[in-house]
Amino acid sequence: MRCHAPMLFLLAVVMAAAPGLPAAEPAAFPRTTIDLGTVVGDLEKSARFYTEGIGFRELKGFDVPADLATAAGLTDGKPLAVRVLVLGDGPAATKLKLMQIAGTSPRGGDNEFIHSHTGFRYLTIIVADTDATLARLAKLGAKPLARSPVELPASLGAGMHLTCVRDPDGNIIELIGPRK
């Protein structure tokens, strides 16, 4: 299996630098980062992957009662127990919310390649040390896809490498950082 993320990453950099349409009127956001929620098949295994393997820190989670989850359109009458993981410090830190909903058997998508189906396809995480991150992930059974880590062109950052791995549910995780 090949990871097509290097081309997508390069395309994103080129598009960001290219002149385009005039910017829309700026919207006011109290926080400029987003949180990402993901339903997982094995909550403990996923929490270990992201904390012990990648380096997220776990914060206090929260519960969403069934009536609220239903009224909001999140579930069909099932409560949610959410584990919150964070990268960084402070209120603007990136948060990953892991959920496993009791009594359900969610279907996995076709995650062979990022172009296999539409929707959010991968997470990009900038790491301080690619080799150390891969060593931690190897202890959890994760290994790089295809021939990664691959060195990125110097124009994208001298000494930066791109590595794709899969989380316990098969989602592609793109790691970018130096090898030490």
What are the residue ranges of the model-derived segments?
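Generic short beta-strand segments
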Residues: 62-66, 101-104, 148-150
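A short, acidic/glycine-rich surface segment
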Residues: 66-71, 105-111, 153-154
